[in-house]
């Protein structure tokens, strides 16, 4: 190509690029002008409104090269109207129990970072139900899992996590530090209590709304301890049952009434109950009932009835001849409302629960009389008051070929129903002492709630193969 041809070619290319650039600039200008008028002329349509006023603001920013039009929707949300929970509703009718949640923590922990826990429970608030447990500060596969059969150490803490998940270091929240706990929501915020320290000088720290509010010193110097399941609140008053003293002799039990984490009143245990530990509490019709563990004598469970309005209580024993502690003797021909029914070995007791509602009463217990295996629910009308009361319905929760453990009550007091639907959980213990081929002791959780329908039974056992952990 001669020099003249090169000049002509370069000139033509330059002119072509100039024309293309001009066309792009004109198109850009037209597009911006069109968008501007389209936004300005279009009436408001279908913008979402949530609990407040919805306004549209158009902001036009000019600079030398482009016109930018930004449309911002500003949603003003009213602050939630928070109120203390009121226990005015009755319990719902229950004819059977439907599955609510199962976390499968041990199965998942075979190949994931799952925390070692025990003493689990569930507790609800206005927006969600959460799982709780006392962590051992290590994972199932961690070397520190050796020795987690022990109940009390400096490494335990009350943790909570979203219901249905397995507890891991990545999805749990520490509520407080300690080796015994309870927690409940009063409708405005959550109160959590943890006991920690040496056996002869333990103490409790009461947290409310995420902050420590009250401290309680040991009053008997012998393992200050509490419920290991949720407390219950009525109009801001949250009674909690605490015990300090021997596990196999007379101890000192107190009912402490809290409001926003602060002590309102303290009562010494009154009534015929002789030993109280690990109460499972629920509320209905402005009364709170706690079904507890007599670790000293009774295979029948003590019952504490609390009036949160007057901040008073009474205690007795479950009248039914259906015994629900473990270990226990065979069911006798008659129950006892005022004294413990002795017998059973080798275990002195286990945390349990009941819902006591006249003809709508249900009792939970291990299937085995002697060990923490299996779990069943028995409908026993008038179990609270009739020493001849017997089962009229039965549902297996865990078959007797599988381990169970602690169990307790909880209710979603914020559910949109005309009654409070009873719910319960069962701790599914795995590892030591029964399965000594692993170094740890931990659990998974299964939870069920009441149904008016008559549903079938199924065994909701843990399901982990311990051999996979070797």
Where do the PLM segments sit?
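Heptad-repeat coiled-coil amphipathic alpha-helices that mediate oligomerization/assembly
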Residues: 7, 11-14, 21, 28, ...
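An edge-strand/N-cap motif at the start of beta-rich repeat modules
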Residues: 83-114, 120
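A short beta-strand motif characteristic of beta-propeller blades
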Residues: 104-106, 214-219, 264-269
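Short beta-strand elements that form the blades of beta-propeller/WD-repeat-like
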Residues: 115, 130-135, 189-196, 237-243, ...
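Structural motif
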Residues: 137-144, 156, 200-205, 248-254, ...
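Blade-level signature of beta-propeller repeat domains, shared across WD40, Kelch, NHL, RCC1
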Residues: 445-447, 454-470
